[in-house]
């Protein structure tokens, strides 16, 4: 994507999901949708609220199968960007191809999983590639675990986004 902004930016929705309930869902998921969230409906939603652009985030129930969202990006490449979910062993070339399709970062959905060790070799390689591409890392984890994860991420120089406000307690 050589010209990321042919549409004037009036406002950006920084987190949305699009999907079809008929897609192949990942095993071990916490949620299974019983409805469709289409790109057309999302673009209409942006218009209704005076927003010109959006960032689509790979939903956890689709795992690392990013094909649906690549198709979604193709429907409005001048208005949409996307976060991919990837395996730690993904190649630099695969990430570069994703960048060409409008990917601007990776989402680490760590809810319900053991805390990763971001100093492990496979993570180091991934974060080096993310930094090289100028992408950001979106962390989806409970707020109590975020300081330790962020401390591990900072040396890589990647921009960090906290997903869902760090999932604070509902009483807040």
Language-model-detected regions and their locations in the chain:
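Catalytic pocket-lining loop regions of alpha/beta-barrel enzymes
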Residues: 119-172
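Mid-domain alpha/beta scaffold segments of enzyme catalytic cores
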Residues: 2-133, 144
């Amino acid at each position: 994507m050589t010209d990321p902004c042919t549409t004037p930016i009036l406002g950006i929705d920084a987190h949305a999901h699009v999907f079809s309930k008929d897609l192949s869902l990942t095993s071990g998921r916490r949620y299974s949708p019983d409805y469709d969230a289409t790109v057309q409906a999302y673009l209409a939603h942006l218009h209704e609220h005076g927003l010109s652009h959006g960032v689509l985030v790979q939903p956890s129930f689709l795992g690392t199968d990013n094909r649906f969202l690549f198709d979604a990006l193709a429907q409005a490449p001048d208005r949409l960007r996307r976060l991919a979910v990837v395996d730690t062993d993904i190649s630099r070339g695969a990430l570069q191809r994703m960048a060409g399709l409008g990917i601007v970062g990776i989402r680490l959905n760590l809810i319900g999983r053991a805390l990763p060790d971001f100093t492990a070799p496979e993570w180091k390689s991934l974060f080096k590639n993310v930094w090289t591409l100028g992408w950001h890392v979106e962390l989806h984890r409970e707020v109590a675990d975020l300081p330790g994860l962020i401390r591990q991420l900072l040396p890589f120089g990647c921009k960090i986004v906290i997903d869902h406000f760090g999932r604070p307690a509902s009483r807040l």
